[in-house]
Design a protein with these regions (language model features):
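Structural beta-alpha unit
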Residues: 1-2, 30, 78-112, 149
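Small/aliphatic-rich secondary-structure junction motif
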Residues: 2-55
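General small-molecule cofactor/ligand-binding pocket signal
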Residues: 38, 88-92, 143
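Short, hinge-like loop/turn segments at secondary-structure boundaries
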Residues: 52-56, 106-107, 130-131
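A short acidic, glycine-rich active-site loop
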Residues: 56-71
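Glycine-rich, Arg-bearing micro-motifs that act as flexible, cationic patches
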Residues: 111-133
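Short, flexible loop segments at boundaries between secondary-structure elements
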Residues: 140-148
Length: 149
């Protein structure tokens, strides 16, 4: 487990996620680990009408989301990741918690560093949070950076 050689840091581009990137960078620098900045493009909710999708191209929309996510990841990489850290970006599609755990497993990551948003209420009780699910699904340690850290 220690030292960490590969760290996956998923981001949703929120302020708490930037804090997780900072923590992941510090750990990657300390352990000379590779850092993978990951963004998961969630499923596109589509409501089909009796007349079809009325010209809505779901595949084109998903490509646009991927392109936008790639650009945002590159910006985060340039802005938050020191040159001393060996880092790369990755965009995948699917349900966030499953994809984060899958990527970490496929990449043979030693650690996942992610943020918590402190969500509460009925959505959290019914669906759970992404960090909680990642902790359940992941095959490696997960470091959750709290909103107030």
């Amino acid at each position: 487990m220690l030292p960490f050689k590969k760290i996956v840091c998923p981001t949703d581009f929120s302020e708490p996620a930037c804090r997780a990137i900072k923590a992941a960078c510090e750990m990657a620098e300390t352990f000379s680990a590779e850092l993978i900045l990951l963004h998961v493009v969630g499923p596109v909710p589509v409501l089909e009408t009796p007349t079809g999708l009325a010209g809505f191209d779901v595949a084109a929309y998903q490509r646009e989301l991927s392109n936008s996510a790639n650009a945002s990841l590159q910006t985060r990489l340039e802005k938050h990741v020191p040159d001393a850290v060996n880092a790369r970006t990755l965009v995948v599609h699917g349900e966030p918690a499953h994809e984060i755990a899958r990527v970490a497993n496929e990449e043979a990551a030693d650690l996942i560093v992610l943020s918590t948003h402190g969500e509460t209420g009925w959505r959290h009780r019914i669906f759970g949070s992404v960090p909680e699910k990642v902790i359940r699904y992941a095959h490696c340690p997960v470091l959750a950076i709290h909103l107030d850290s």
